[in-house]
Amino acid sequence: MIKIIREMPHGVAALCLIQAFSTFSYAVQYSSLALFITKQLGIANLSANSIVGLFLSFSYIFQLIGGVIGSRFISNRLLFVTTILIQNMGLFFLAQANPSLLNIGLSLFMVGSGLNVTSSNSMLTQCFIPQDDRRESAFFLSYAGMNVGYCIGYIACGFFDYSNQYQYLLYASILTNSIALLIIIKNWAYLGDKNFPLPNLTKRNWYFIKNILAIAFI
């Protein structure tokens, strides 16, 4: 395994670690969100189920949006950094365990976690040329890192489900996201987009893009 990683281009090992650390926070939300809402915030089960359903549904929708934005309007590495920061803001609001902050916290985390899924895979793809056979092994390692993040996240959730004190779990998610952020910053030079079209856009294109982004933000 170590030999395979050493034969990979620069940035691949970093992306595998990023997958492991950044997946932890989503695993926490996926497995413990309903319990956090009902047991710690005291929200009714029916409302909690609706909130969790909307959260999961819109997370997949934002993955599609992230695929459109990445490499077109913003580089994938910058998109990933931005979305990690948005996730951490959402996790901080959730960690306050205040029902009035639930919607804004979940919304921020949902946007961040949804938009950055495609960016990490796109960065991994661009580490290779299309004819490079090592790309399949790289994606295998990347998904292995993702599974490690899910596994650790699920195990950690099991310890906190009995105490009903999810703040420490949410702060741990902020920590793992921050580690992923530091890794991508350290390997910034190796994870750039190839043939990034943004520098070649005309003023008219920029005006159109800014209007679209403003509408999306509103």
Predicted regions and their residues:
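Hydrophobic core of transmembrane alpha-helices in multi-pass small-molecule transporters
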Residues: 20, 101-116
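Glycine-rich segments within core transmembrane alpha-helices of 12-TM secondary carriers
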Residues: 134-155, 161, 176-180
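Intracellular loop-helix junctions on the cytosolic face of multi-pass helical membrane proteins
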Residues: 1-7, 157-218
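Cytoplasmic membrane-interface "Motif A"-like loop-to-helix N-cap segments
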Residues: 72-84
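Intracellular juxtamembrane helix-capping segments at the cytosolic ends
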Residues: 115-130
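C-terminal ends and interior cores of transmembrane alpha-helices
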Residues: 82-103
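Central cavity-lining transmembrane alpha-helices of secondary-active solute carriers
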Residues: 52-70, 117
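Short amphipathic helix-loop junctions that connect adjacent transmembrane helices
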Residues: 29-47
